[in-house]
Amino acid sequence: MLKQILSEMYIDPDLLAELSEEQKQILFFKMREEQIRRWKEREAAMERKESLPVKPRPKKENGKSVHWKLGADKEVWVWVMGEHHLDKPYDVLCNEIIAERARLKAEQEAEEPRKTHSEEFTNSLKTKSQYHDLQAPDNQQTKDIWKKVAEKEELEQGSRPAPTLEEEKIRSLSSSSRNIQQMLADSINRMKAYAFHQKKESMKKKQDEEINQIEEERTKQICKSWKEDSEWQASLRKSKAADEKRRSLAKQAREDYKRLSLGAQKGRGGERLQSPLRVPQKPERPPLPPKPQFLNSGAYPQKPLRNQGVVRTLSSSAQEDIIRWFKEEQLPLRAGYQKTSDTIAPWFHGILTLKKANELLLSTGMPGSFLIRVSERIKGYALSYLSEDGCKHFLIDASADAYSFLGVDQLQHATLADLVEYHKEEPITSLGKELLLYPCGQQDQLPDYLELFE
């Protein structure tokens, strides 16, 4: 079964529905391994092909290529988000995203007050510039008056006789006084312009500080309101829980894969698959289970009774194929029998639906109860287990004349009984700690596996 999935790189949705979350993660891990293996084969084939003498291709200018970064194990370097000590926790990332969104929203809200302040500031500048423009004509008028006076004096000098020494002294004194007044006026104008510029800068700086303070306060308010929002809190909790669940499942799948691989290497207690030489080539068909004593010719109906609680979801042809598969391939392997006797194991059941298996387990009310049923969807088995959190289901691969959980084919068992005995002491998964403690047997008068042994 696993080989077929990996060869096609496709799993039927009905089959995927039979898998537990742990088995799904392990299966995805195996499919990823198969992808890498195929990629390496293609790369090796390409290298062999390129090593042959061929006509060199003209290299393009500024040719680009991709080189994978390798880790310490010489494999492609992979960074698993959230597992490194430098990675930010999920809630910290959420807080940063909220803070950034709140800041952008506060900036948008502050855009209108910013425009209003800018217009007021521009109007005040225009008013003050008009005031200085009014002051400027007075200075110019003063200059014009002094200029006219100087021209008049020059004309008078031309018509007058040569001035005396005293007149020259008086003229020089008046000219120097005019120059001093002009210098004082220019200095006053420069001081006014500098003061106006300084006031302009201080006003602009003050307005910017006020707007920034308003933005910061608004950002904090928006961020606080979003964090206190019940819908956002619920969404955050769900996202965080889903992220933690995915991370734990992936980690658990890797741990289970390593644990079972190590168990297979150590060969724990002879539970590994026995050599095919020890299995007879043509084993004899085991005896049928004893029928109930009350079934006589008069009471036995013309049509065999079926478990009325089982709802058949498969077509008759598909169900017949599964029954034929069990009789032809599984009976020679003593599927469903006790390990040391020819009696049917109490945990073995026939073709049961998922709903019926859950009902049987819940009726016991004992965590650790389990049963193995023939799958209603595929040629294989499913182990149903009752834990503290509810019912779990694990698909068992029986495609290679051996039994192992789908996705972890390193540790295989010769019979279903061997698999059950092994997991009475060894948990199925490291996270769930599922130990097979209490077999869940038949509850109806007629066993649900009769059709498999008829």
Swiss-Prot record:
Q: Quick check: keyword Lyase in the entry? A: no
Annotated tissue distribution: Ubiquitously expressed. Aberrantly expressed in some cancers.
Q: What does this protein do?
A: Inhibits estrogen-induced cell proliferation by competing with PLCG for binding to ESR1, blocking the effect of estrogen on PLCG and repressing estrogen-induced proliferation. May play a role in T-cell development and function.
Instruction: Provide the positions where the record notes the PTM Phosphoserine.
Output: S118, S124, S261, S315
Comp. bias (Basic and acidic residues): 107-120, 240-259
Alphabetically list the UniProt keywords: Cytoplasm, Phosphoprotein, SH2 domain
Protein name as it appears in the record = SH2 domain-containing protein 4A
The record's note on quaternary structure and interaction partners says: Interacts with ESR1.
Taken from the UniProt entry, a GO cellular component term is: cytoplasm
Which compartments does it reside in?
Answer: Cytoplasm
Pfam families annotated for this entry? SH2
User: Which residues are in the SH2 domain?
Assistant: 347-440
> Which Gene Ontology MF annotations are present?
phosphatase binding
Record-linked PROSITE patterns = SH2
- Looking at the record, which segments are called Disordered? 45-65, 107-131, 152-177, 237-302
Entry keyword annotation includes Glycosyltransferase: no
Superkingdom of this protein's organism: Eukaryota
Which InterPro entries does this one have? SH2, SH2_dom_sf
